[in-house]
Design a protein with these regions (language model features):
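A structural-propensity feature for long, helix-poor, extended segments
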Residues: 65-76, 83, 293-318, 322, ...
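Membrane-embedded alpha-helical segments of transport systems
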Residues: 66-71, 112-124, 132, 176, ...
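Transmembrane alpha-helix interface/packing and boundary motifs in multi-pass membrane proteins
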Residues: 24-38, 68-80, 155-160, 254-266, ...
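Short helix-coil transition sites and intra-membrane helix breaks within transmembrane domains
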Residues: 29-39, 77-88, 120-124, 260-269, ...
């Protein structure tokens, strides 16, 4: 209770409150820009938080994370160009409704659904994270090794993506994590005689390159592309009848989003698609879906925002990212000298409550910005690409250099950007690479510690019940895509 009161009193400081509000405003703005995303913005902003106090830095990134998820719905509804991947499902019914002249109603419902989902997710975070951290007190290096392997295996289950491509992306991330000197044996790996690489490749320039650099190259080929948006008079609060129609959908999507968010490697995009599909499946009249059904907006918006707080649960309690953005927030914690896991809850309780409060404030703040400033955000989305993306690239270079004032980091960012762009062209996602990069170091470190504990015997893993549970879940998660593919082939066989 004392830690909560200390955290609460911290927000009476105009500086900390201003940081959260600024992060929220930036999140909505970035989320509303097609091509930009809260993940990219978090990666770009992370180096600039190094001079901040840990509480303010993590509160800023957490607020940006929450608000960016909602911000994507603005362009999804007005321009039919989702500002963030989780908002793609919102466009299915949001844009058709806006074309009918109800853009204000669509945005109002999106804001209300997002707030409900976001607050629900923060409650899940407050309740579940401490409970999970208590369980993690029983974890040693073998358990963390098995958990990290399970987290990597979850890449195969991400809905809508190729399981093989996700696993390849994760493997590339793990490979990048091995660059540098092995401090156990003193052997240099993949340094090619360059002493600057002996300490390894820092994950921040890689993150910036994969998200911002790759998107800069991609958008450079769209300089002549014009955007058009539907007219927007004012954002309107949904009526009682609108809420009544969508209430069960919102409640269901809150549960779906929170469950998806709790799973390592899953995120808002998966939750939004599932929220939309379930809203359509439970609807008695499905004829209006795709034509402007309110439930087609409420479902994905509640689900993707419900995933935000839930994705922070494994991030804070176990040190296993729940999504690409939480992987970057995890990186921010590490950069500030904070190790996520059970000890964080005993050693830094004020920081944790500050994160909870920041996310709670951000959810109310982005709704206010959505209602008051939607017309402004809608105009900003029409900024010409030739002005926007050079500025993003400059920020990427400055952010990468600011880390250690080394030109190597800028080159790493550029190479990562080229790699990310090439992989996008072949249908790969950047998120699995980030997950592999973050978890790769954990896998290697805990594996070596475990083998020392077991006197270099691999059979020692089989004597730990929790390890066996995680390894069984790993096999299951790896098998599910294969089973789904086999079922799909069997169904399509009679038709062909």
């Amino acid at each position: 209770m004392e830690a909560f009161l200390t955290a609460l009193s911290g927000f009476s400081d105009p500086y900390l409150l201003g940081v959260v509000v600024l992060g929220t405003l930036g999140g909505v703005l970035v989320g509303a820009m097609p091509g930009l995303s809260s993940t990219m913005a978090t990666a770009l902003l992370l180096p600039f938080t190094l001079t901040m106090e840990p509480v303010a830095a993590i509160a800023l990134l957490s607020a940006l994370y929450c608000a960016g998820t909602f911000g994507g719905s603005i362009t999804a509804i007005l321009v039919n160009a989702p500002g963030a991947p989780p908002a793609a499902a919102t466009a299915f019914d949001g844009y058709p409704l806006a074309q009918k002249g109800f853009a204000g109603k669509a945005l109002g419902l999106a804001a209300v659904s997002s707030v409900i989902g976001g607050i629900f997710s923060v409650i899940v975070l407050i309740v579940a994270a401490p409970l999970l951290s208590r369980v993690a007190y029983n974890f040693g290096p073998p358990e963390y090794f098995a958990l990290a392997v399970f987290g990597l295996s979850m890449l195969a289950t991400i809905s809508g993506e190729s399981a093989l491509k996700n696993l390849i992306g994760g493997a590339i991330g793990v490979l990048i994590a091995t660059v540098g000197m092995d401090f156990t044996t003193g052997v240099e790996r993949f340094t090619f005689g360059n002493w600057a690489l002996s300490e390894g490749i820092h994950f921040i320039p890689v993150m910036i390159g994969l998200f911002a650099g790759a998107e800069f190259i991609k958008q450079s080929g769209k300089l002549d592309q014009k955007r058009f948006r539907v007219p927007l008079d004012a954002v309107m609060l949904p009526t009682y009848q609108d809420i009544k129609t969508c209430l069960s959908t919102i409640a269901r999507s809150c549960g779906i989003g929170s469950f998806i968010g709790l799973l390592p490697a899953e995120g808002g995009t998966v939750a939004a698609m599932m929220g939309y599909n379930e809203a359509k499946r439970f609807a008695k009249d499905k004829s209006q879906f795709g034509k402007g059904d309110l439930r087609g907006i409420a479902g994905p918006e509640a689900a993707n925002n419900a995933a935000t707080g839930a994705a922070m649960v494994p991030t804070l309690a176990l040190g296993i990212p729940g999504s690409a953005t939480t992987a970057i927030i995890l990186g921010a914690l590490l950069v500030h000298g904070l190790r996520p896991g059970p000890h964080l809850f005993t050693e830094q309780p004020t920081l944790l409550y500050s994160i909870f409060l920041a996310m709670l404030i951000a959810n109310f703040a982005f709704a206010a910005f959505g209602f008051i400033g939607a017309k402004v955000f809608a105009r900003i989305t029409l900024i010409p690409i030739e002005y926007l993306w050079p500025a993003v690239f400059i920020l990427a270079c400055v952010g990468s250099y600011a880390l250690e004032q080394a030109m190597l980091d800028i080159w790493v960012m550029i190479i990562a950007g080229v790699l990310g762009f090439i992989m996008q062209r072949f249908g790969f996602s950047a998120a699995p690479i980030i997950m592999g990069l973050i978890l790769g170091k954990l896998v290697e470190g805990t594996l070596k510690q475990s083998l020392i504990i077991f006197d270099h015997s691999w059979f020692g893993f089989l004597e730990r019940p929790i390890v066996l549970i995680f390894l069984s879940l790993t096999l299951l998660s790896m098998s599910l895509p294969l089973i789904s593919e086999m079922r799909a082939r069997r169904r399509s066989a009679p038709e062909s």
